[in-house]
Design a protein with these regions (language model features):
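Sec-dependent signal peptide recognition
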Residues: 2-10
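Mature extracellular/passenger domains of Gram-negative fimbrial/pilin and adhesin proteins
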Residues: 2-3, 19-182
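Hydrophobic h-region of N-terminal signal peptides that target proteins for export
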Residues: 11-19
């Protein structure tokens, strides 16, 4: 799973529109004032955490038919050099292409490129609380380094469980994690 982050940028555009007449011809004059403020982020992402790969290894379909989902695979987002005078809170969220049959979960793409696999990937807190795509989880920042642990898991679609038609083979998916500072 590829997880990436972008930077913060605040853009404020103010437009003043006025009309002027010269020699009986009306001209539209537009003055655009642009103010850009680049915000200093309170934390840096630890080197190597910009791209996080998660390998589920081998998942036996019978396990999904019995348990509906896998045990969570842990991963961490490590923030370093945090300056809480800039912000002492961060909201973390995940985004990606949503599985239409498993709301709030990522869809997957079979490596063979053919068909629907019948599974999705979910995110949860370290304690097992489900985090739907685009939902933010708020965390308090400490001065210096901070580490946030999450789990991802594979879950089967209900109709595929009932029909016992989970597609076998390798799959992939990607998501983006977002850091929003208060």
């Amino acid at each position: 799973m590829n997880i990436k982050i972008g930077s913060l940028l605040l853009l404020l555009i103010v437009s003043d529109i006025s009309f002027a007449a010269d020699d009986g011809i009306a001209y539209l004059q537009q003055e655009i004032k642009v103010k850009v403020e680049v915000l200093d982020e309170p934390c840096d992402i630890a080197p190597g955490d910009e791209l996080i790969n998660i390998d589920y290894g081998t998942i036996v379909d019978k396990y999904l038919y019995i348990n509906t989902r896998t045990i969570g695979e842990k991963f961490k987002i490590n923030l370093i050099d945090c300056d809480i005078s800039i912000s002492d809170r961060v909201a973390i969220s995940f985004s990606g292409i949503e599985n239409s049959k498993l709301p709030g979960m990522l869809s997957v793409i079979p490596m063979s490129g053919q068909g629907d696999v019948g599974i999705g990937i979910g995110f949860e807190t370290e304690s097992g609380e489900f985090i739907p795509l685009s939902d933010e989880k708020q965390y308090k920042l400490n001065e210096g380094d901070n580490s946030f642990t999450f789990n991802t898991f594979v879950q089967a679609e209900i109709d595929r469980l009932i029909a016992r038609t989970i597609k076998l083979g390798e799959f992939e998916s990607s998501a983006i994690f977002h850091l929003n500072y208060d």
